[in-house]
Regions:
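Conserved GNAT-fold acetyl-CoA-binding loop/helix
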Residues: 31-56, 66-67
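Conserved acetyl-CoA-binding loop-helix of GNAT-fold acetyltransferases
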Residues: 123, 129-142, 146, 165-169
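Conserved N-terminal entry element of GNAT/NAT acetyltransferase domains
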Residues: 1-20, 28, 33-40, 197-200
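A short helix-loop-beta-strand connector motif used in the catalytic cores of GNAT acetyltransferases and
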Residues: 56-70, 90-95, 117
């Protein structure tokens, strides 16, 4: 899909009314981890995107629309949401009980204290490979600085080679890894990798 010359890329804070599209994008970004969590929370017969939407409609929660920035394309006053980043300050609670779900436990071990944690970043397929993802990552850096943080962190699957290379190109480096517990809903096997970028 070619972007028209008069299309304008913009970033804006998400609103509660955006939570359905946030759920769709977060499902993409998590490569099955969100689907696993939402399936566990769903009522019998409930669409898991309904669960994701409901979770992101919450306020004063880490996984909230309040921690989401959307990237949009605007043309003639019409806005199309094409991607998003969900990020928040990561403060590790050393007294917290360890994650008791074996599928989720590896990810809970991959936390970088006092970092701006990018927990989800995604674009819809038609808008990939156009530099928009890099712009979203740069936007996260600006937001981290505004919050007084000097590093960013994220988790990537080692088998997601393209994403890992992008993060390395943007200055992220590996600091830890944990083996994934395989599950049919999770798209990758191998290791989950914690990557960090210092910005101050």
């Amino acid at each position: 899909m070619n972007l028209a010359a008069n299309m304008k890329i913009q970033f804006r804070p998400a609103q509660k009314s955006d939570c359905r599209v946030i759920a769709s994008l977060y499902s993409i970004s998590s490569d099955g981890v969100a689907d696993y969590i939402w399936t566990k929370l769903a009522q019998p017969g409930e669409n898991i995107l309904d669960v994701g939407q409901r979770r992101y409609e919450r306020e004063n929660s880490l996984f909230s629309y309040q921690n989401c920035t959307l990237v949009t394309l605007s043309q003639d006053d019409a806005e199309t949401i094409v991607g998003m980043v969900v990020a928040f300050p990561m403060i590790v609670d050393e007294t917290a009980e360890p994650e008791d779900d074996p599928v989720l436990a590896p990810y809970s071990k991959l936390e970088e204290n006092n970092s701006y944690y990018i927990c989800g970043i995604a674009l819809f397929p038609d808008y990939r490979n156009r530099g928009i993802g890099t712009q979203l990552m740069r936007k996260a850096e600006v937001d981290a600085v505004a919050k007084g943080l000097t590093k960013l962190s994220l988790i990537v699957f080692e088998q997601n080679v393209a994403a890992k290379r992008l993060y390395e190109r943007l200055g992220y480096h590996e600091v830890a890894r944990e083996p994934i517990v395989p599950h049919p809903l999770i798209h990758y096997s191998g290791d989950a990798v914690l990557m960090v970028k210092e910005i101050g």
